[in-house]
Amino acid sequence: MQPSSNNCYDTGLREECGVFGIYDLDGADVSPSIYYGLSALQHRGQESCGIAVSDTSGPKGHVKSYKGLGLVNEVFKESKLEELSGNIGIGHVRYSTTGSTTVENAQPLVLNYLKGSLALAHNGNLVNAMELREQMENTGAIFHTSIDSEIIAYGIARERVHSKTVEEAILRTVKEIRGAYALVIMSPRKLIGVRDPYGLKPLCIGKRDNAWVLASESCALTSIGAEFVRDVAPGEIVTFDKTGNLKSEFMPVDVKKAHCIFEYIYFARLDSKIDNISVYEARIRGGATLAKTYPVDADLVCGVPDSGLASAKGYSEESGIPFGLAFHKNSYVGRTFIKPTQKERESSVKIKLSVLESVVKGKRIVLVDDSIVRGTTISNLITMLRKAGATEVHVRISSPPFLYPCYFGTDVPSNKQLIASSHSTEEIRQQIGADSLGYMPIEELQNMVGDLPICRACFDSHYPMEVPKQDISALLES
């Protein structure tokens, strides 16, 4: 998703979103389940959220929807959920990849068109969004948002007019789009899930009694008491209708799979399982690899909450250095990495974390974190540890240095904002004030996920598909 503030595409940070869908064949209202599912996916986006529902036994194509800026529990009060009655529905949490943070850009998107209604929620990024949008506008399309998700929704609606089924319209649309996408789509009588052929974005299937569920992560299934069935396969379109059966078909493409490694390093929740791999165990393995690669004499291994904790435990187990908690986290402050502006990121670090002085005073600390993007956050944490009496701080990072932008929806900014693109490891170590610094060797990255084929383009520029020839921010400034 890539719009700009002065026309349709924004030069801001890319996002990660969460999608959720449920179809209760017994006719029960699903909005409370969507609420809890989105709450479990809140870590994937904190700027806006939305829910769209319909009643499969009511007037065909009548969709009730509500969306707003803020967290799920801020936007949806009990009275609002009661208004959203229906037995089929989808939901979305957003951190903007494209478009400004306005309620117009919140999802799900709901379209009313010749064949009825369509609601869509999207996680991911299209690399040919600007090209497709221009083509559509030249044929009379009028867009109401600045997000590339509307391009997908409009494409499906346009193709549906000439297709026998919505699935056929989706198949025609995905032939035109390039990039990363996990979609949940609600037509008047169907719930549909779509995953891009590379498998870049996660999507899984669950079941609770007589209800089918789709979600970005398995933790959202657990939150509503649903059983995990399986992941949606890369390139698969799954449909649930009134028969209660799962219908599956695949896009007629054969590409090399490229699952986003950043899900396992940072984005996914610790209790999720994605493509048969436990996120927790992947991070434990990452920490163990760091301990083997960068041993150091130290008294305590600590992780940066939350995504650095499991890797720190893995480092501790492999090295034999005790694991401890160096920070208290204020749970009511959001994630610093997905704050919209640098100023907000910097100010929220100190509000979010405070050092446990009695734990670190007089000790040599190994501090494990998932990544260094700009270096500001880790520098602040090292300063806080030293002020609390830590004698040494050795930093270990469970990802390689970020060198290239991501075009597929992960919050990796342009090259000029990536500290590793213009500084050596030693220069970064000096700049952040660490006694030593070790990144995950890129050749060891695969160990986290076994034989799962991964995309690691933000580290080595080997993109799984053709991407813009120059950095997207440069394109937008021209």
Set out the residue ranges of the language-model regions.
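PRPP-dependent phosphoribosyltransferase catalytic core
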Residues: V174, R189, G225-D231, T383-S478
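Secondary-structure transition/capping motifs at alpha-helix termini
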Residues: A141, H162-S163, P295-D299, E317-G324, ...
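Short, glycine/charge-rich flexible loops or terminal/linker lids adjacent to PRPP-binding catalytic cores
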Residues: G320-I365, T376-S379, L403-G409, P413
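Conserved short alpha-helical segments that host acidic/polar catalytic motifs at enzyme active sites
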Residues: M1-P234, T239-A298, V304, E392
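Flexible loop/turn segments at secondary-structure boundaries
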Residues: T97-T98, N128, L200-K201, L221-T222, ...
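Mobile, glycine- and charge-enriched loop segments
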Residues: S354-V368, I372-V373, I397, I472-S478
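A conserved beta-strand->alpha-helix junction
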Residues: F76, T145, E150-A153, F323-G334, ...
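Extended, hydrophobic alpha-helical segments in both membrane/secreted and soluble proteins
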Residues: V301, G308-Y315, S319, F323, ...
